[in-house]
């Protein structure tokens, strides 16, 4: 999964992938009606997903595919209403025959899909799990951490790596001269990862500056509204 900081950048990356003939899905606010389906497929072997960092948050990406989503989709295709599907996936006690029938159908379908998806889930785990590629650092550390947290869920393997450029918004606005000089001194090619604490610390300081600036702007707005 490749995380971007805006819809515009997710679409630019999507066009570049199209140009290279790489099949992928795009998850952003423009595609919200397909969000559940894209998230459900994002953990399949070989799946490539481009997402804005906030899109689909709160939904775990299941390695191999999401059996629960596929089972719910079966109920939808069978003509069950959204309210009945919600009841079918719930646990409240009931003697309503329609709900009980829907629950039985959902349970059977979920078990079937879990068995079907298990070999693919193992294949994804053996390959290292979900790989998160951050195309740049967000101005908020919290959002960066949410993107990182999409991989390695529930004991599954996973990895995340952010790729930075001195022309990224946060680096351009708050990247220090010291950082620029350090990059020039190291003379490392673009394919070599840099895991230096001094670089991580400089980026974190830049994010703190942005967060502080945004907080002050919100505070000033509230004070103005209270006048």
Give, region by region, the residue ranges found by the protein language model.
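Conserved phosphate-handling catalytic cores of large alpha/beta enzymes
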Residues: 18-214
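Short acidic, glycine/proline-enriched loop segments that cap or flank alpha-helices
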Residues: 1-4, 194, 219-223
